[in-house]
Amino acid sequence: MAVGIDSKWFRRYGTGAAPRRRLVCLPHAGGSAGFFHGWGTAFDYGVEVLATRYPGRQERLAEPGIDRIEDLADEVTAALLPFADVPLTLFGHSMGASVGYEVALRLESRHGIRLQGLFVSSRKAPHKLTPHTTYLDGDEALLEEVRGLGGTDGELLDDPDLREVVLPALRADFTAVGTYGPRTAAPVGCPIVAQVGDADPHITAEDMAAWGEVAPAGFALRVLPGNHFYLVEQRDAVVRALAAHLG
């Protein structure tokens, strides 16, 4: 039972009722649990939201970041086990989609836990990724990549002191993103819902459709208005789709 468990890996948002479902949110590279703070009270009673706290930021600032998707997935999987007393759905945005996919595989193969669903957002399917590390050549190249994607507070990147604080986590995350893939198209046993913004400069609907190749249990593709961070402006639409799925 997860009642009373205090995990450094998750910020828990409850509704005051015993959970019958859990939604686990996995942030983008450079992101934090705070990105999903507005989701905590967006669902009906009985749905608990777990916003994942990656090391190297916010409450875990003193910890080193993890620079491999597989290693990050190992840690998240282990941390999730006490919360698997009710059905789990994962929502991963950008880097978080890759982490979510790897967590789904580990929960199934190592622990016999099949997710209720996997939502993947703004990230190519694992077997369609190609290594991309040119932005790791130096701090300025990395910062340019982060600015181009959006989603990170400009003040953090422009202020020299704040930049020094966030750079280690950014470098770890973008190393993980850039060195992950390609890999075989290992299927997951739960339905997958892929989402993307129609004006995303990096990911197309065709890219996201490839997730269907690892989703024998069911697949749906949703294209919403917006860019790589469409889910900020389309938050209500995203939450409605998740609520319908969670039941």
Q: What residue ranges belong to the model's regions?
A:
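Domain-scale detector for complete catalytic domains at protein termini or as standalone homologs
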Residues: M1-F91, M95-G247
